Every structure is written in C-alpha cells, then in structure tokens.
C-alpha cells in the first residue's frame, strides 16, 4: 500500500504556528486525553472499504475532491465509495448509512450541515467505524475522530488582510466604502471565515478607515444561503441600487471565488468601477480574473493537500498505528476534536506565477489572461 508521510511531518513542524495548540480528546466518548482510549487500538484492515461523503460537486474544489479521492484510494489499495449529497442533508444521511451497510471501516465526511449528521454517525461509530471530517467540522456529536482542514479563522484573516492591501494599492487614500459577504450559514466554516475577517476589519470600521455603507455587518445579514452565486449577485444588485446611486463602492469581502465573480459582475452591470474583492479556493476562472486584474485576490487551499493529509490518517490506521497526532483542536459543541490543520496561502497578481509555477495547466490559464 502506498504510504504518505510528508503531510504529517509538516504538521509536526507547524505545531508552533497553529491558532491553538491545545491537545484534545480522541477517545470514544471520553472527556480528556488522560481518560482517552489508546488510539493505537483504532485500526482498519488492509484493503479496507473507505466511504467518502461530499456535500456536493457544485464548485471546483469538491469536483477535485471527488476525482482525487477515487483515484488515490484505489491506487493505495483501498475500496473507495465516493458520493456527493447535492447539498441535501437527507441525501447525505442516506448515503452515509449505505456506506456503513456496505462495510466501510472509515468514513470521510464533508458535511452539508455540520449539525445534522449526529445520529447516523453515532450509529457508524458504534459499529467501530473511524470518522474523519473533511474540510468542515462535524458538530454537536461525539462521533468524529478528527478533522482535516485548512485553518478557517486564519483563512478569514487572510481574506480581510488582502482586501485592505488591495484597497491601499488600488483605491487611493481612506476612507473606503465596502460591503461584507459571508458563506452558507449551514457550513460551520462560513462563520469562522467571517469571524476571522471581522477580527481584522472591525478595528478599521471603528476608526473610520472603512465604512460599510449598507450597515449590514452581522453574519446573518452577510450570509449567502447555500453559497449560491446567484443569491449573492442578487444581494449585491440590491446593495448597489439601494446604497450606491451617488457613490462608488471600493471593496467587498467575499467568502469564496464564485461569490467574488458574482459580486464583480453585479458591480460591472451597475456601471461601477470594479471593486477590490477577496476570494477563496483558487478556482481556475478566478485565477484568470486575478491574472487580468479583475479579481484582486483568492486564498488557495489545495484540494490535493487535504486529500493527502486524509490519506495519511487512513494509512496510519491501516499500518496499525492508530490516529496520528494532530496539531490543533476545536470545540464542536460537544467535545474538543483533533484538527489536522493546514496553512492556506493568499494569492494575488503579484505572487500568482510563483505559487502556480509547477502547475502547467494553471500556468497556461495565467499566461492566456495576463
């Protein structure tokens, strides 16, 4: 079986750099590491069936996860079952139950709604299945053994810092007129992205550097149901028509690339100069827009790195070594969950070619749009 050790080594080296390096419970229902079950006892068999439950395939990162998991699990000698729930919680619950019935020994779950999988995952855990959250936290249940994700609060901080940098570079002197967008409220990452961003932006709002002209500064006001680009564009249309008839919008905090493109399209259609807009996921279309100067930034969270880290955990279980040591933890509402946290990267026009230098396909996109 193919083994991957580079990610775990990087995690060990990065421990001092994580947002919180507190240790966490990884035992079945225990409250502390002192009482935790010995993780070395948690194993899976050679060639185990691994179920991967993704929320949907509507964005580039989830399409990539679907393709990469199928290929990498099969190459490593496992039996993969990879499905997506089309953003419907009932679909995901049924798919996970079917994976259990088909003999999955590991479940990798990117939840549609992190609070709605407790019952089906608790049944899976009772059957001895190891449960790994992928990209998103599984909330309000003991039935999660660890989560692989890029630091969500850090991602939000990076988005906000890039927005401020872009405003200074492209929009002259402060004050700046901005608006705030957030992701889908069912996705636990969306709140964390927003919280991280606001930790950077709120002091600038308070001191007058930034003005949120609409006054919509709460997560509930900024949230975009289901991460739907069309809903984001409709909200941006309304914000512009209601607040910017006689003024320019300078920048927008956007939680991902699809919403960023919707925001920019709305601004163009309203006759506004293109605002400075943040993003997330380094989608190919947004890479083209960054190369051309249309979108200011994105935050790269390479899917391959997430899958590689998940594979290393599965390989560790198959080798009889149990769950590897994590470098972070987070409260899921019931317990502290081990987090295998990876570091995101801000990408702007200034470092675009350097970051993607080894990716021929993306470099072709960049060169076609410079």
Show which residues each predicted segment covers.
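Repetitive helical segments and hydrophobic/amphipathic motifs
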Residues: 12-13
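A residue-level marker of the well-folded mature domains of exported/periplasmic proteins
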Residues: 2-8, 22-370
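C-terminal motif of bacterial Sec signal peptides marking the signal peptidase cleavage site
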Residues: 16-21
């Amino acid at each position: 079986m193919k083994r991957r050790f580079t990610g775990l080594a990087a995690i060990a080296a990065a421990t001092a750099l994580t947002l919180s390096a507190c240790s966490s419970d990884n035992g079945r229902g225990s409250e502390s590491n002192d009482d935790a079950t010995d993780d070395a006892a948690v194993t899976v068999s050679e060639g185990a069936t691994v179920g991967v439950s993704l929320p949907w395939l509507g964005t580039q990162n989830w399409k990539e996860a679907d393709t990469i998991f199928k290929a990498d699990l099969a190459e490593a000698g496992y039996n993969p079952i990879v499905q997506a729930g089309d953003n419907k919680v009932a679909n995901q619950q049924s798919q996970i139950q079917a994976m259990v019935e088909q003999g999955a020994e590991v479940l990798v779950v990117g939840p549609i709604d992190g609070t709605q999988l407790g019952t089906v995952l608790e049944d899976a855990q009772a059957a001895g299945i190891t449960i790994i959250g992928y990209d998103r936290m599984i909330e309000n249940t003991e039935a999660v053994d660890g989560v692989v994700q890029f630091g969500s609060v850090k991602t939000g901080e990076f988005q906000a810092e890039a927005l401020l940098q872009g405003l200074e570079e492209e929009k002259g002197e402060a004050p700046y007129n901005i608006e705030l967008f957030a992701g889908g409220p069912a996705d636990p990452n969306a709140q964390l992205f927003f919280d991280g961003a606001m930790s950077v932006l709120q002091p600038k709002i308070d001191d007058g550097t930034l003005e949120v002209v609409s006054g919509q500064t709460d997560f509930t006001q900024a949230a975009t149901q289901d991460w739907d680009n069309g809903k984001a564009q409709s909200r941006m249309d309304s914000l512009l028509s209601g607040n910017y008839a006689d003024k320019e919008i300078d920048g927008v905090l956007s939680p991902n690339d699809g919403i960023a493109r919707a925001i920019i399209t709305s601004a163009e259609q309203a006759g506004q100069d293109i605002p400075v807009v943040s993003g997330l996921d380094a989608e190919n279309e947004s890479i083209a827009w960054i190369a051309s100067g249309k979108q200011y930034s994105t935050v790269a969270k390479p899917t391959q790195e997430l899958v590689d880290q998940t594979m290393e955990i599965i390989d560790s279980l198959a080798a009889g070594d149990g769950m590897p040591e994590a470098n972070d933890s987070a409260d899921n509402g019931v317990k502290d969950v081990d987090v295998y946290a990876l570091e995101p990267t801000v990408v702007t026009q200034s470092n675009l070619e350097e970051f993607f230098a080894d990716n021929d396909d993306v470099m072709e996109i960049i060169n076609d749009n410079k």
